[in-house]
């Protein structure tokens, strides 16, 4: 990973990146469907959602779907290749220029897909979102605070460190406060509206004089966190316990926060090596 020596900007996602938690998906779906569907249907839907997450269905992470027709598409470089219906049966391609395709990138995206399918009122979905996130900071469902990761990030020298999350305020800030990382990053962006938000950030970084090969983006959602930087010629790291049906060659890929800690350690080691080489020069 010689390219690590060239990195001067690191963009971190928050949810699914600085902590990993997949248990919330069950509670999120249950909160949306309770009082509208039977317990049996709720349980079946939760099972379906985890099967998608774990790659047990024809529909997988890394697929696109049409938010109106709820047809699914395997893809290469975000271009639809094959079409599937909700049951996972292959169907005729119906995508056109007007189709609004959504990338299934993470558990939050699976929950949004369920909300579409079950016709959950937006207000109910929003309340469930905030309620489940509030739970994630309580003792019963508490996310893991990986101080070893944050300490390793804080060791990075001569790097511009950015946290960009699509989570809005106040919940995004509440997670940052809980993780005690307010002093870890140079810039914070909440409600980042990725992927467009990260494209705009890249434009800003370019204006500041950074070159694409100096930028590393780390996240669990390929479409939101990685594709914009990858297409611009920058470096990317996918963090996900579960596989994505996506053939894109990211610069690095790790399955866990442990793997991310190892990557950041390598960055720190490469910085030390850089200083040694400069000293010899």
Please identify what each model-predicted range represents:
Residues 1-7, 38, 147-155, 162-281:
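Asp-based, Mg2+/Mn2+-dependent phosphohydrolase catalytic module
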Residues 1-65:
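Active-site neighborhood of HAD-like aspartate-dependent phosphohydrolases
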Residues 25-33, 46, 104-112, 130, ...:
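An amphipathic alpha-helix signature
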Residues 54-134:
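A metal-dependent, Asp-based hydrolase signature
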């Amino acid at each position: 990973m010689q390219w690590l020596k060239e990195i001067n900007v690191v963009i971190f996602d928050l949810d699914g990146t600085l902590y990993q938690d997949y248990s919330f998906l069950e509670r999120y779906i249950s909160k949306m469907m309770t009082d509208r569907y039977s317990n049996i249907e709720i349980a079946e839907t939760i099972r379906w959602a985890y099967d998608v997450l774990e790659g047990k269905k024809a529909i997988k992470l890394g697929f696109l779907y049409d938010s109106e027709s709820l047809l699914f598409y395997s893809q290469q470089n975000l271009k639809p290749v094959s079409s599937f219906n909700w049951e996972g049966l292959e169907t005729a391609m119906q995508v056109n220029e007007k189709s609004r395709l959504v990338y299934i990138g993470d558990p939050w995206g699976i929950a949004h897909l369920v909300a579409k399918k079950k016709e959950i009122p937006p207000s109910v979905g929003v309340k469930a979102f905030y309620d489940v996130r509030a739970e994630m900071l309580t003792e019963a469902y508490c996310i893991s605070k990986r101080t070893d990761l944050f300490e390793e990030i804080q060791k990075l020298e001569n790097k511009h460190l950015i946290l960009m999350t699509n989570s809005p305020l106040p919940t995004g800030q509440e997670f940052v406060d809980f993780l005690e990382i307010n002093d870890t990053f140079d810039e914070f962006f909440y409600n980042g509206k990725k992927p467009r938000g990260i494209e705009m950030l890249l434009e800003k970084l370019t204006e500041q004089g950074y070159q694409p090969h100096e930028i590393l983006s780390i996240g669990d959602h390929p479409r939101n966190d990685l594709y914009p930087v990858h297409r611009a010629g920058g470096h990317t790291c996918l963090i996900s316990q579960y596989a994505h049906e996506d053939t894109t060659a990211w610069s690095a890929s790790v399955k866990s926060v442990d793997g991310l800690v190892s990557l950041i350690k390598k960055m720190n080691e490469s910085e030390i090596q850089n200083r040694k080489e400069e000293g010899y020069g």
